[in-house]
Amino acid sequence: MRIEKSAPLLLSTLMIAVMLLSGCTEPEAKQVPTREGAIPPDAAKSTPETDANPPEVHSNEFRDPVPLPYPVNTAGAEDSPFILPDGDILYFFFTPDVRVPPEKQLLDGVTGIYISTKRNGLWSTPERIILQDPGRLALDGCEFVRGNVMWFCSAREGYTGVNLFTAMFEDGRWRDWHYAGDTLNKEYQVGEMHISVDGSKLYFHSSRAGGKGQLDIWVSEKMDGEWQTPQNVESVNSPENEGWPFITDDGGELWFTRTYKGTPSIFRSRRIGDEWSFPELIVSSFAGEPTLDGEGNLYFVHHFFRDGIMREADIYVAYHVSQNTAYHSISRLFAQMMKFHTKI
């Protein structure tokens, strides 16, 4: 999978980890740090007030984006969000320090997929989801959850490259992880993906041959239990990068990330009959990986850059204008509070 300079943090981390796993031995035994404890003391929390390139909304359907409050966002890097339809369960990728090279992130004991739940309007302390056997290396991310099945990408021992895996939620935890097969991983070259609510269509990005640009969005239909040869979603692709697709549960909207004026931005295409409409810009300026809850609230990752260098990443939300503004106001309050902290 080709990785562009502006691609999300997670994938660049995974790709370098691939080169390391083939020669890695068992990691040295050490005390596993906490997520917050792994954030370096000199990490300064970025805030909307200090952001040189804040995300900008281009649609009157959404309010101005705000960062999710602590304990979801920290002075580390929160990336690759996935929100469930009820809006109360959030999955995301975390690494404590974007300055640390991937070969060290692989061994830090905290980089990986996390989950946070919202109760009474407040997000819980995120917990890491372990998707590998004890003593074996893996760097997991780009999670997608449907029911009791999680799809995720991983660079791990015993496999070459970044591959898709699945896991099952049973007895209160994720288990029974399996390689998703050569058809998806090798033949179709599936990257980050989203499956329609009826399970019949798999949308994904890939640099596979036959596309319009660098990364393109493709769709594969399931027939007789098998994923068919992918088709290019031509109406949304361009010579630029298009990827990180999200399909609304009604199947009527395709959300994705595209390079716009040199930075990742969020676009939407609507289903009209059997075709996807010309994409419209929704959020620009280092915004990507859109994911929506059932009320139409838009969650995404925002990367903070200063002097051309990435400093941090946070999960943001742009509330739909039809939604209650109470939690929106709480998020703004937390954002104001966080500017006084150099480290959470």
Spans of model-derived segments:
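C-terminal motif of bacterial Sec signal peptides marking the signal peptidase cleavage site
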Residues: L21-G23
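Bacterial N-terminal signal peptides that target proteins for export
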Residues: R2-L11
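Short, conserved micro-motifs composed of acidic
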Residues: E28-I344
